[in-house]
């Protein structure tokens, strides 16, 4: 059986993707495929063919799509940045057709957006450290983990000058940031 689908979703379907990558693009692209690989009827793509939902199941409003050239790819703009979480795209059955008039079937795909993370490595998170001891040690180590498919922006991390809070830490000033070898651990000296 041959059906009309939105096949390009499977490239993203089930994947974990960098939130920042999607938010830099400010759009999602979907390639619609006709039955047996024939072209779709582009006049049947009007923005009412998909439902896009965030992790809470809330419908995310999308404007009518823009066709990319003369292809079967359509671009759906994003009016706001997407938060980290699992998203669902449902292509509604019967909402578009190929040039032979064969309507599509319902298709649902999901993808997860994640952000890079930073975690205190030394001292270990939750470790009790006295103010005097902390002040004389002169540094903290922080491990940065990029989102899947992304790399760390080392120059940006080296330029960071975070602030500390808590008993006595308010007067600390970061004097240098160094990468520990080729790892994702950075030492913030004060």
Residue spans of the language-model regions?
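Aromatic sugar-binding surface patches on proteins
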Residues: 69-77, 181-190
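Extracellular/lumen-exposed scaffold segments
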Residues: 94-98, 170, 181
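Acidic, Ser/Thr/Gly/Pro-rich low-complexity segments and short DxT(G/T)-type signature motifs
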Residues: 1-26, 59, 81-138, 163
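Hydrophobic residues positioned within well-ordered beta-strands of beta-sheet architectures
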Residues: 28-30, 48, 74, 89, ...
